[in-house]
Every structure is written in structure tokens, then in C-alpha cells.
Amino acid sequence: MPARAIAGVPDLMHHKYVVRDGETVWTGSMNWTDDSFTRQENVVAIVRSAPIAARFEENFAELWHTGAVELTGRVPPNPVRVGDRKVRAWFTPGYGEALSTRIAKAIARARRRVRICSPVITAAPVLSILAQVVSEGELDLAGCVDQPQVHGVIHQWRQNGNVAWKLPLLERVMTGDFAGKRSEPWRPGGGLHNFMHAKLTVADDLVFLGSYNLSRSGERNAENVLELDDPQLADQLAAYVDGVRSRYPRFEFDKVTG
């Protein structure tokens, strides 16, 4: 089978998807590694829809023919009916900023619940609205992050004045009901990769899941997200988030040094 490497500098080819026979898509947050299957939290979706499969095939063709992350993700996120559900396939970097704004608006419109799993939260639209929601204290908001990865972000922001303005927002968000998995910090020489790796947002009955962290870098990487309007699935995945966060202690912001 032909294969092609996509340069990951400066932005990552971060997709994890398969299209089978132009009819079915397998996608989500899980890399194809032993640790991903056995040591990490991940979410995977299977969508049986030729129109959705066509969107992913178009995105694959962008990567295959250009070999350049920055020239991809330009497939429009037009809605598709899959049974009685409305589904959108989002791709970045072409629609990266639009995706962050879309998720932020869904959170802002939520009236019953918001559940989040994301290793980090750094995308400005999402960070801003979450800080507002936590401050208002009226919405059932909870989630889980990867504590060492968020601590790494905090350390970087403290060293870089250009993004230090985000620190009060992140600190405010993490005073909410967020757990932090104490994973093994990433090391260049390898080791255990047991990160909290799921990328999932539930806002009332709307679900966003895929390869995209809620991050500024994610807006620029080659990523994909499924947006699904499905009350039953939203209930299932909100319960999944609650299960994940119940396994770990609350996030601790004040233990960051540097």
C-alpha cells in the first residue's frame, strides 16, 4: 500500500481516521499505538454515511497531493443527514478558527450542561467563554484535563509575555469542576504514554469529538472533528466524561512552578 509522510513542522498532521469503501468513517482521538489502546482515555466514532466519507476522502486527497498541512482542511463543514441526525465534519487548519468559535458558541448557548475532555484548553474563544461560565456559576459544567500538560502550558505562558493574558482565564476555568489526570510527563527518550487523551465537548445535546484539542495549536494543525446533534449520544458521552473525571483528583493550579 502506498504511504506518504507529512512534515510535522511547524504544525502537526494530527488526524487519526480511516475511510472504508467510501461508505464508513472511523475517527477520533486515538493514535494506533499500544499505549493509546491500553493506557489512555480516547473516544472513537464510527459513522456509516457516504456523504461524510466523501468529506474525509476529500481531506485525505488534500494531504496526499500537497504534502503541506497549511494547505489542507478546506473541506466545507456543511451539514449532512445521517439517519435522523445532523452531522458536520470539520477540518483544520482551513476551518480551525471557525471550529473554535463554533464550539465556544455551543458552550455559550448551553442551558443544561457542558462536559469536556481535552488534554489542554488554550483556544481563546473556548477559554474565554468557559471562564465566563465558571464565573457565572449557573451552568452544570465539568470536565477533565491532563494535569502535567496543562502545567507545561502554564509554565510556557509565564515565560512568554505575548500569551500571558490567557493565564487569568485558564486559572478561572480551572477553579471550576475540572479533574486533572496525573499522567507521566512526556520525555524525549520515550517511556509510558498514559495521557488523558480524549478530545470531547458535550453542550446540551450537541457533541464535538475528534482529534482536535481545545487549543490554539489545534486550530493550526491538520485535525478533524465530528459535530453531532444527538441527544442520546450526548447523554452517553456526558456520562463518559463524568466517569473519566471521577477517576482523578481535582486539577491543582497552584503546584505549577517557574
Model-flagged regions — what are they?
Residues 64-72:
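Proline-centered turn/helix-capping motifs that create local helix->coil transitions or kinks
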Residues 1-26, 30, 34-41, 46-65, ...:
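PLD/PLD-like phosphodiesterase catalytic module centered on the HKD motif
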Residues 71-80:
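Long, charged amphipathic helices and adjacent flexible linkers at domain junctions
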